Structures are given as structure tokens and as C-alpha cells.
Amino acid sequence: MAVKIRLKRMGQKKAPFYRVIVADSRSPRDGKFIAEIGTYDPTQEPSAFNVDEEAAKKWLADGAQPTETINRLFKKAGIVK
């Protein structure tokens, strides 16, 4: 089972809010997930990115692949180099 760390869209139309989740790569974007490890709100100034660092590092160590966007956010937060 290929596991990915990715964003799940929430919020209203034209007001996105995302949850950072760990999910099987074959499940739909807003479908079933394994764990929720944080949130991302791009509408705030500056953007609010909150994530459980320990959980993120654990999932990365276990082989979960972050998406491009999550990788960029992790680098900005100092979780990944």
C-alpha cells in the first residue's frame, strides 16, 4: 500500500481550508484517510500551517511520500530539509 501525505480540501466555495492527512495514494482526495496530522489555511495573512511535527516525521520515516505542495510546506516549516 503506497501511503501519501497530502491535503484534503474543506471550507466553503472560494474559501478553501485544508487538512493535512495521511492516506492511501489510491483513495480520492476527500475520501478515506489513515490519519489527520495538521491544517493549512492559505486565506490568512500570512498563511497558517499547523502540523504535528512528531507525527509527520514518524510517517515520513515509515515511508509515506509527501505531495509537492506538502513537501514545500514542510520545508518552509523546517520539518524536512
UniProtKB/Swiss-Prot annotation:
One of its GO terms (molecular function) is structural constituent of ribosome. Transmembrane segments: none annotated. GO terms for cellular component: cytoplasm; small ribosomal subunit. It holds the Pfam family Ribosomal_S16. One of its GO terms (biological process) is translation. SUPFAM superfamilies: Ribosomal protein S16 (SSF54565). Keywords: Ribonucleoprotein, Ribosomal protein. It comes from the Bacteria. InterPro entries: Ribosomal_bS16, Ribosomal_bS16_dom_sf. Belongs to the bacterial ribosomal protein bS16 family. HAMAP family: Ribosomal_bS16. NCBIfam families: S16. This is Small ribosomal subunit protein bS16.
